[in-house]
């Protein structure tokens, strides 16, 4: 299907650069941006152009993973993001520094970013307090509760639960679609990769080993006699801790902050997004999206490869 979508565009536009509308003068000296998605075809491209009311210049079309990517130039408006919702593709203005060919640093949130679940919610279900903990998690991710306070509250509900339920959750840990391909590709190009998570070491350290990541920071359950005590051991990894982790890794690896990426879905990821050269909100909460540099609503984690490959083409 992706090949058909790709060819529907290249058959109409066999040479670049060219105007989307052949009979009208294109926008001159526009800003570069990309549209991308697994179902991006000529119909979606034309519908987007009609909504925008501009004759964009199209400079390139290529594929990364299963994504079709179109490089355009035009007069940028923030409304473009709303228009892409209607055609179910993603968009990104190319006003950031990181590129695939230049090694940098990626720091990821874990729950609902690197993996498809919120681990503490799954643990709570097995401990019989699922609904209570899920409600607190949602409120915290929306930024309605102080993260540290909400975390200690959620962990407190798990007091007395057997340590074995952590293993049950880890055995069925669903990786986010596109995670493995994205990490392996970045590592191939010399990128450093890390997790900074408000989740727990039992899962973050597992992912670090599985994916051969360079670093992982997360919270630690306090466990005594094979049971959770309901306490968090040591400092809580909150928004500021995540931001400091990213800064520390930049210094340790000698990487310019302009060549770093932070990606996450919750309010507690915004601080590290602001430190990074590129902050990406991934299928994020409504409060988070307007504050992020790039928003991904439809693509999987290979969206990062789309963004980085685009910067290599401008």
UniProtKB/Swiss-Prot annotation:
Documented EC number(s): 3.1.3.3
UniProt GO BP: L-serine biosynthetic process
Top enzyme class: hydrolase
SS bond list: none
Pathway field: Amino-acid biosynthesis; L-serine biosynthesis; L-serine from 3-phospho-D-glycerate: step 3/3
Any one GO molecular function term: magnesium ion binding
Highest taxon of the lineage: Bacteria
Residues annotated as catalytic: 109 (nucleophile), 111 (proton donor)
Cofactor annotation comment: Binds 1 Mg(2+) ion per subunit.
UniProt keyword terms in alphabetical order: Amino-acid biosynthesis, Hydrolase, Magnesium, Metal-binding, Serine biosynthesis
GO CC annotation terms, alphabetical: cytoplasm
Entry-linked Pfam families: DUF5609, Hydrolase
Function noted in UniProt: Catalyzes the dephosphorylation of phosphoserine (P-Ser).
Entry's family note: Belongs to the HAD-like hydrolase superfamily. SerB family.
Protein name: Phosphoserine phosphatase
The species this protein was found in: Haemophilus influenzae (strain ATCC 51907 / DSM 11121 / KW20 / Rd)
Gene for this chain: serB
């Amino acid at each position: 299907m992706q090949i058909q979508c790709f060819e529907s565009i290249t058959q109409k536009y066999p040479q670049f650069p060219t105007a989307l509308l052949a009979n009208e003068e294109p926008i001159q000296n526009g800003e570069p941006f990309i549209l991308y998605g697994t179902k991006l075809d000529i119909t979606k491209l034309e519908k987007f152009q009609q909504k925008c009311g501009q004759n964009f210049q199209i400079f390139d079309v290529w594929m990364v993973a299963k994504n079709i990517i179109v490089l355009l130039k035009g007069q940028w408006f923030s409304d473009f993001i709303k228009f892409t919702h209607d055609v179910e593709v993603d968009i990104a203005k190319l006003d950031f520094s990181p590129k695939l060919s230049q090694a940098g640093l990626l720091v990821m949130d874990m729950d609902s970013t690197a993996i498809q679940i919120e681990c503490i919610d799954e643990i709570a279900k097995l401990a019989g307090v699922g609904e209570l903990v899920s409600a607190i998690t949602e409120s915290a991710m929306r930024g309605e509760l102080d993260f540290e306070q909400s975390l200690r509250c959620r962990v407190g509900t798990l007091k007395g639960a057997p340590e074995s339920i952590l293993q049950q959750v880890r055995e069925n840990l669903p990786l986010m679609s596109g995670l493995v391909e994205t990490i392996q590709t970045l590592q191939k190009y010399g990128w450093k990769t890390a997790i900074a998570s408000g989740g727990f070491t039992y899962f973050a350290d597992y992912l670090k080993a599985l994916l051969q990541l360079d670093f992982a920071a997360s919270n630690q359950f306090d466990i005594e006699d094979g049971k959770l005590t309901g306490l968090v051991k040591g400092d809580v990894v909150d928004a500021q801790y995540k931001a400091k982790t990213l800064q520390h890794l930049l210094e340790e690896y000698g990487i310019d902050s302009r060549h770093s990426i932070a990606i996450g879905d919750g309010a507690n990821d915004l601080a590290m997004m602001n430190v990074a050269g590129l902050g990406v909100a991934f299928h994020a909460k409504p409060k988070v999206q307007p504050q992020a540099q790039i928003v991904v609503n439809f693509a999987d984690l290979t969206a990062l490869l789309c963004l980085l490959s685009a910067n290599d083409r401008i």
